[in-house]
Amino acid sequence: DDVNLKDKQDSTLLHASRLAAKIDILPFLEGKVSIANIQLFGTQAKLYQSSPEAKPNFQFILDTFSSNDTTSSPLNLHIGSILLRRVDVSWDRQWIPQKTDGTMDINHLHLNDIALTAHLRTLQEDSLNIALKRLSINESNGFTLKNMTFDLNVGKNSGELNNFKILLPNSSLDIPSIHSKWDNPSSNSNWKTWIQNVAMNGNMQMELLPSDLKSIYPNFRIADRPIMLTTHFMVID
């Protein structure tokens, strides 16, 4: 309880009222990292970059977990449950002036009351299986994400997204399923070449009240008529 983490300038990077994790020992002996649960409650994280030449104040944490050791074991991570409650995160690029029009500023973000519930079933070099059961965020300039959920399973040559839902105060987006397939990219291929070989199909239902996005697009402040869309889409390589 009451965990404090300082950055290299001796400023508070993170303060958590409660931080807990439970690690499964037996999988660790087999070269796997299996964490039963991670809990982070009542937390404030202050992230910043003081100048264009300076590194972000959290860079030293990323450097700690990075490695140039090519003989290390392949990535194999499982986290049974991730719980975040009452988490506030700020991000400031300190040399850039703040916007004054009351809209969201990506250089000076303040995210409040973040709540998250997720299950990372598998994370390997060639696969990802994650279930997001809850994500809610309030942004200081008025944007509110009431909830976001999805199930994502990605392998070497295919991916599947199920139960993708976004809920705003007066809007919703529902994608029951997206299925996609692709060829493994060659070592000399680029992103554009790879994306041209992706096949995809799915369904989408959307009801959007533009004023829900007024903190991003100010002209939407007076838009009070909902936009409704139901569609099936297919992309063939």
Model regions and ranges:
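Repeated loop/turn-to-beta-strand initiation elements of outer-membrane beta-barrel proteins
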Residues: 158-161, 237
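Short, intrinsically disordered, charge-balanced linker/junction segments flanking boundaries
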Residues: 13, 28, 222, 230-237
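Hydrophobic, lipid-facing positions within transmembrane beta-strands of outer-membrane proteins
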Residues: 114, 148, 227-229
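N-terminal amphipathic/hydrophobic interface segments
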Residues: 1-6, 130-135, 145-147, 159
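Short, exposed beta-strand/loop patches in secreted or surface proteins that constitute
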Residues: 121, 150-154, 233-234
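Short sequence motifs at beta-strands and strand-loop junctions characteristic
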Residues: 142, 223-225
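Transmembrane beta-strands of outer-membrane beta-barrel proteins
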Residues: 162-165, 203
